[in-house]
Amino acid sequence: MPDKTVTKIDSAYSPKGQLGQKYLASGKNISMRLWENEQPNEPKEPTAREYETVGYVINGRAELHIEGQNILLEPGNSWVVPKGATHTYKILEPFTAVEATSPPAQVHGRDEN
């Protein structure tokens, strides 16, 4: 019989990853994370991840640098980073966004480098 347990997560008590993300709800095949009030910065080294990411901007602006494209992300925008796509972000102003990853990013340290 499938597990039908519902879990509620309060972001005020969520664990924080090494990159600054807060880990939110997580299931067997998908997880959520919150980037809260990220400050302007230069892009980090581009990376490719073993998971797909979808995101939604709540506040602020950032550039997604992905596979030779620069995409401006503003409040109300959503985006997809395909599994294996080389990418990085440049935060232009204090930035808050929610992302979902599949498979879950924080399993086995996938999210920490």
What are these regions (language model features)?
Residues G68-K83:
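Short acidic-glycine-tyrosine-enriched beta hairpin
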Residues E42-K44, W79, K83-T88:
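Histidine-centered metal-chelating micro-motifs
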